[in-house]
Amino acid sequence: MKSRFLKAAFALVSACTLMACTPEKENNAAQDAAKTAAPATEAAQQTKDENMNKLTLTAEWDKVFPKSDKVEHSKVTFKNHFGIELAADMFVPKDTSLKVNGKFPAIAVSGPFGAVKEQSSGLYAQQMAERGFLTIAFDPSFTGESGGEPRYMNSPDINTEDFMASVDFLSTRDNVDPERIGIIGICGWGGMAINAAGIDTRVKATVASTMYDMSRVTANGYFDSANNADARNEARKALMAQRTKDFKNGTYDLAGGVVDPLPDDAPYFVKDYYAYYKTPRGYHKRSLNSNKGWAASAGTSLMNTKLLAYADEIRNPVLIIHGEKAHSRYFGEGAFEKMTGKKANVPAKLDATKNWSKTVGNKELLVIPGASHVDLYDNLEKIPFEKLNEFFKTNLK
């Protein structure tokens, strides 16, 4: 079971995550699995797509959720400080009740890790636009319709900058109040959002929903099972071997997306991922997790970069949302504890009739009874949009 669990994690997150939490024998098996999932010829196709140099934006509505008649939708682009052009969906509310002096409060959204804006982040953005906020959902650098070469890479620095670039874009729009801008990060982009909030004082309120701390899981393995120097050293060796191989071949092997076909005895969270990314519910042709995944050497720098290093210095409000049954909940609890210096102390069993929360100053941890990690991707009965609405209306005024 341990081997299957870790291999599933490998497919869903990245090669470096699995290598950080498995012994050498399982590392070799993981590398073999990656080679099988992404032969060099396929890797060449996957890492040299049309958005490397010039953005190609789809004109049709190709989201995995229905289009709302309460908002105006358009595509926009903007560059980050690394010169990478980002693509985003912008949702402008027809409801102008939150406008002050002709300007909207605004929210930038991204995630989950390995998803595209046509999936969960777009749903969040549209839902918040229905509530009166001008929103954008953007594809991070190297993914989706955004630029960046090579494809299917990630970086704690560049992806944090992506959030800050979204604030650049929003704060200079004529119809946005630059003093009322917030951000939402989903899954692995929850940690990126908190990191961005720790740097960018223009971000007045931050939500991390069903968050991962990608630096923690990459360096320590799942549930900190490989939190020791020897394990990290072995993981670094494997990553460097992958880099050498990629450079020699002139291509980038892919780690593999969600495991397919799905084993009957797969862990529940892998089944949840499959139910979202591999079925009509959430599948998208540009989504890494729906297809062949990240480059196998992606996220190398996450091994030595702690996203939450200065989270305790964030002065503006932060709301962390997790499901009671989410395998990832410990990331949110850890982030809350880092920011507040107080233990989360989530009860072992929650009252099924109401959400559980703990607030310290302007930082809040909210846990949804019965909800899993993936429930907070698209389950409108589980995602507490009215809580998000209240949070942003209170803090973006």
Predicted regions and their residues:
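Short beta-strand element of the alpha/beta-hydrolase
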Residues: 100-112
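Catalytic histidine-centered segment of alpha/beta-hydrolase-like enzymes
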Residues: 368-382
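Alpha/beta-hydrolase active-site loop
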Residues: 153-174
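N-terminal cap/lid segment of alpha/beta-hydrolase-fold proteins
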Residues: 51-102, 377
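Short beta-strand/loop motif that positions the catalytic acidic residue
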Residues: 314, 320-322
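Conserved alpha/beta-hydrolase
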Residues: 127-147
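Alpha/beta-hydrolase-fold enzymes
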Residues: 194-279
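The serine-hydrolase catalytic nucleophile loop
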Residues: 103, 114-126, 140, 332
